[in-house]
Amino acid sequence: MKKEKYVAYISTYTIGNKDQCGIKIYDVDLEKGYLTEKDQVEITNSSYITISHNQKYLYSITDFGVESYKIQKDGSLKHINNASINGMRGCYLSTDYEEKFLFVAGYHDGKITVLRLNADGSVGEITDEIYCKGMGSVAERNFRPHVNCVKMTRDNKYLCAADLGMDHVNVYRLDHVLGKLKLEDIIRSEQESAPRHLKFSKDGKILYIVHELKNYIDVYTYTNENDNPEFEKIQTISTLNDYHASSSAASALNFSADFQYLVSSNAGDNSVVVYKIDEQTGLLEKLFCLPISGDYPKDAALFPDNKHLLSLNHESNTMTFFSVDLEKGLLVMNGKEKKVASPNCAIFHKLNQ
């Protein structure tokens, strides 16, 4: 029986020439819990990447809009095309579950952009643009819209857009023919909490929202009875220990490959937190919150074997690796750190053999 093989894609805030990263591609050693550099893609400020649900294509933010790539058999990336988003550089992107549309979140201009996807994975025309409006509380990052994450519900009916400037998540109905969005609901968060990222459980019935400035995760149930989206909060849980750095910002959310665990990181506190997900209720149990031996972790992810963990440390320009015992709540540094300029997002991808 052949061993499963994976590559890891790491996006970076870099100018993307031969000396300055772009997207890094690594071979994954599951036994050692380590990454070995394989290739890199020249692209400017690839602040976030996503892989299509059919696992065929990778899409990336860039200074010039978005770039599309065909994932090759060995995990390397073949460029398809680029497309403008008619605005400032985005910070997050995702696709719908039918691979018909690409959604881009605009932190700097508070904009949501919808682009059509073609059958060959290329990005087509813009079908909708929504400039979020309003004034938030008077704070450095919370006085105007900052759309930081856009994700479809797993039933593929609604787009949820986290606005950390306005402290809420807008819920839009997607017109699957025209690619237009219509506001249906608003999930309101605590003032100055800054909802940053969101994820839906594997069955689509639970929504997790991490709040950057207040360092906690809200857990909601999601139902769509009578074609009406309803979200009910069932839990709020901190991303920090009782003892922690005075200034900290919760970062991205990542599921384990089996959807049994949820991972986040705390920039400033420089720690990673792992939760066990209750299979029946979706509630979170904090297993540990421990230091990551780097500065300002923007992303953290479990390896596909759930025995190792990777942290992307934005300010120290490093990746750090750990062995993990999830049941015992242990995290032990594993091997030397790797230098990588301004890492921001990590994705593990299983290769077809």
Whereabouts are the PLM-identified features?
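Blade-loop segments of beta-propeller domains
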Residues: 37-99
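Loop-centered beta-sheet repeat module
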Residues: 156-215
